Amino acid sequence: MQKPINENFFIAQIGRTVGLWGDLKLHLHTDFPEQFKVGNSYQSNRGELTISDINFKRGTIRFQGYESIDAAKKLTNTKLYADEAQTKEQCPLEEGQHFWFNVIGCTVNQGDELLGVVDDIQRLADVDYLSIKTDKALVDTGLPKNFLVPYIDRYVINTDEKSKIVHVKDAKDILEAS
C-alpha cells in the first residue's frame, strides 16, 4: 500500500523540459543526490515515477513512460518524495551524521538540565540549526518559548538517536540571550 505523500520527504522538484526526448530539469531538495539512480522509483503528486535516465552534469532527469517532449511536459512542477525506509536504504551516512527525521523529537540536554525538545531543523546558509521548543520549567522563569542552536561542534557534543537525546554545551547561553 502506498503511503500518503504527507508522510514522505520532499526530495526534488521537476522543472521545464529540455530537448526532444523527455528530459526535464531536476531541482534537488536533498543532501543526497546519489539516491537518484536509473531504475529507482519515487512517489510524486502524479503517482509513482521510475527514473530511466539521469544526468547530473546537465541537471536533467527522464522517467519511464515519459520519453517524448509532449509526455514529459505533463511532469513540469511535479514534486518527488521518498519515504523513511527508502531514504535510509539509498542514503548512506558517514560517522556522526544523522537524518533530520531522527533528530526531530529528541530532547536537548546541557549537562543534567533539560533545555527543551527539537521541533524542527532549519538550514540557513550552509549551517543547520536545531529549532528547540524550550522546556516549560524554563519558559516559566521568563525565557523564550523557542530558540535556535547551530548544529555544529561548538554547541553539539553528540546526538544519541537510541536515547533520543542531543547533548549540547553553551546552548543555554543562546537561550538566555534570545
Curated annotation (Swiss-Prot):
It comes from the Bacteria. Residues 95-174 form the PRC barrel domain. Keywords: Chaperone, Cytoplasm, Ribosome biogenesis, rRNA processing. Its main location: cytoplasm. GO terms for cellular component: cytoplasm; ribosome. GO terms for biological process: ribosomal small subunit biogenesis; rRNA processing. InterPro entries: PRC_barrel-like_sf, PRC_RimM, RimM, RimM_N, RimM_N_sf, Transl_B-barrel_sf. GO terms for molecular function: ribosome binding. It is found in: Cytoplasm. An accessory protein needed during the final step in the assembly of 30S ribosomal subunit, possibly for assembly of the head region. Essential for efficient processing of 16S rRNA. May be needed both before and after RbfA during the maturation of 16S rRNA. It has affinity for free ribosomal 30S subunits but not for 70S ribosomes. Belongs to the RimM family. NCBIfam families: 16S_RimM (TIGR02273). Binds ribosomal protein uS19. The PRC barrel domain binds ribosomal protein uS19. HAMAP family: Ribosome_mat_RimM (MF_00014). This is Ribosome maturation factor RimM. It comes from Sulfurovum sp. (strain NBC37-1). The lineage of its organism: Bacteria, Pseudomonadati, Campylobacterota, Epsilonproteobacteria, Campylobacterales.
